UniProtKB/Swiss-Prot annotation:
Organism this protein belongs to: Arabidopsis thaliana (Mouse-ear cress)
Stretch list, region Endoplasmic reticulum targeting: 369-373
Name of the molecule in the record: Glycerol-3-phosphate acyltransferase 9
Keyword Endoplasmic reticulum carried by entry: yes
Enzyme class: transferase
Length: 376
């Protein structure tokens, strides 16, 4: 039998049907050869620079990764370590968690049994009342840290009450305030929160001079700026603590510092906070998790390990702008805590890109197409 038997032999006429001659469909005298110098379709669709920019933004998104939790590396998925992991889960949830809940409840009982009478009976003695309330706030924050089995190591001199000074720190979670507050009763600048956190803000934390604002209200900025200036001038005011990033970052990066804290004409005392993620990631992603669930996550971990550095106070240099001063302090905090600096505004986390930004990108792309047309 011939070797070609069983194979489909395609005739020339069949090939002609599959691949018709384009010239047969053109008017007489026309040719498919384009005149030299004309724009080809290949040139018009050459958008490789735009695609390169878009792909680069996806692959190396230095903004989004500032607000992502780092998943722990799996270590227990083998036959030898998995039983140990299961035993650890039982210990953390069935032994440590109930003990920590009892510790926190006991702390609240002591705190409220003292705070309410002091607030009611010492209304006319503001100096004494504020001093006792300051001690009580430090105490309840210590109970909170104990409920996570917090292992916190402080470096440097303890903050003191002095006029015309402000403390600034990098921000990972709302527990930053608790970790710092157990050592010194700071008056903090904080976003107004709903629920039980908002109740504590408007009652207990109000007693130490904390200042609240609503990020969505533009008029709050002027009110807060005035309160800041008045607070730093007070000789008896609690030390003022500001988180100039304005949002929680995952403790691997620092975003831009707001310049408001650096234009108060006072001494700035930097504080660097670094969490060890060996047991739990202390980063609070407020978009995905409530603060209550965040606390439960901490209370069911083995421990929260943290280091705090009180760095050398800084003053603005001659000829230095507020933005330059803020960047210099950010350099100090980033270097001490081992954090990477990124040139992003943390408030972009709460807002969508402006339509003007999209219009500028569209205009830039249109200009590149027009420039290519003019070249032809």
């Amino acid at each position: 039998m011939s070797s070609t038997a069983g194979r489909l032999v395609t005739s020339k006429s069949e090939l002609d049907l599959d691949h018709p001659n384009i010239e047969d469909y053109l008017p007489s005298g026309s040719s498919i050869n384009e005149p030299r110098g004309k724009l080809s379709l290949r040139d018009l669709l050459d958008i490789s620079p735009t695609l390169t920019e878009a792909a680069g933004a996806i692959v190396d998104d230095s903004f989004t990764r500032c607000f992502k939790s780092n998943p722990p590396e799996p270590w227990n998925w083998n036959i030898y370590l998995f039983p140990l992991y299961c035993f650890g889960v039982v210990v953390r949830y069935c032994i440590l968690f109930p003990l920590r809940c009892f510790t926190l409840a006991f702390g609240w009982i002591i705190f409220l049994s003292l705070f309410i009478p002091v607030n009611a009976l010492l209304k006319g003695q503001d100096r004494l009342r504020k001093k006792i309330e300051r001690v009580l706030v430090e105490m309840i924050c210590s109970f909170f840290v104990a409920s996570w089995t917090g292992v916190v190591k402080y470096h440097g001199p303890r903050p003191s009450i002095r006029p015309k000074q402000v403390y600034v720190a990098n921000h990972t979670s709302m527990i930053d305030f608790i970790v710092l507050e157990q050592m010194t009763a700071f008056a903090v600048i904080m976003q107004k929160h709903p629920g039980w956190v908002g109740l504590l803000q408007s009652t207990i934390l109000e007693s130490v001079g904390c200042i609240w604002f609503n990020r969505s209200e533009a008029k709050d900025r002027e009110i807060v700026a005035k309160k800041l200036r008045d607070h730093v001038q007070g000789a008896d005011s609690n030390p003022l603590l500001i988180f100039p990033e304005g949002t929680c970052v995952n403790n691997n990066y620092t975003v831009m510092f707001k310049k408001g804290a650096f234009e108060l004409d006072c001494t700035v005392c930097p504080i660097a906070i670094k969490y060890n993620k060996i047991f739990v990631d202390a980063f609070w992603n407020s978009r995905k998790q409530s603060f209550t669930m965040h606390l439960l996550q901490l209370m069911t971990s083995w421990a929260v390990v943290c280091e705090v550095w009180y760095l050398e106070p800084q003053t603005i240099r001659p000829g230095e702008t507020g933005i330059e001063f803020a960047e210099r302090v950010r350099d100090m905090i980033s270097l001490r805590a081992g954090l990477k600096k990124v040139p992003w505004d943390g408030y972009l986390k709460y807002s969508r890109p402006s339509p003007k930004h999209s219009e500028r990108k569209q205009q830039s792309f249109a200009e590149s197409i027009l420039a290519r047309l003019e070249e032809k």
